Amino acid sequence: MTTTGTILDRANQLLLAGVVEERNKLAVSCNSSETTLTMSYALGSLRENTVFEIGSEMMFVWEANSTSKTVTVERGYGGSVAAAHTAGDIATVNPRFPRGQMLTALNAELSDLSSPLNGLFQIKTVDLSYNGSDRMVNLTGVTSMIDLYDVRYRYLNDDYPVVRNVRLLRDMPTADFASGFVLAFDSYVRSGTVRVIYKAAYGTLATEATVLDTAGVGTELEDLLVLGIQIRMVAGREVKRNFTESQGDTRRADEVPAGSVTNSINNLLRLRRDRIIAEASRLTRQYPLRFRK
């Protein structure tokens, strides 16, 4: 099964477009609080006032000792989370696209895809034990819901008739309905098991080891997520070229005019739009609109 780290790797390879970033290796394992780290090879560009990345954690270098190959660092730099690392882990020096930021971009993309404008979603189910008398029932375990898709009750083990005249109520008092989501019955339903099928937003991918399936993301979305990460990571890079107090990277106006970085994602935006339309069409075919009478 595909992990979050695999998606980040694919996006990073496309973003770098063949550029090889400077790397080193951690020589000795460290916990999440150690501030003196030992590297396996010559420090190279690892010097004072630079940053490097191991996994999704960024570190700021306060001091570097080229003789002992050690660096004194600030852990969890730039909003990243300090973590334990193992000897042999790769340290990327001054990464162009920090993996922690890429993970944030990935989760932002998942949230955006679930918006009504884009129309993508995952299908989830919850089974309720209904007593046949309560008019409103708490949707146990539901934390997020876009809309109801289908409601059925178990008449026999091979017969689940549709329950009609039901409504979804949101933001109900949690003192009475723990989830805040309520299924309201406007007509009689016999006691038994009621299966609720609903549309939900995609979940959050917490770490690089998280499997996409846990967030409701199928293999069909993998290329779309890679596109989203690329677009979000490149979108803000033009800003630093417009600082007025100092000159940034040398700009060859004839070859790389102002706006070139921003314009470089135009084709990606078009491809993303087409892929969203295609995925929305697939979901509409699999889960067509239903009318309850």
What are these regions (language model features)?
Residues 35-38:
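Short glycine-/aliphatic-rich beta-strand segments at the starts of folded cytosolic domains
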Residues 1-31, 42-59, 63, 67-70, ...:
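Glycine-enriched, solvent-exposed interface loops adjoining structured elements
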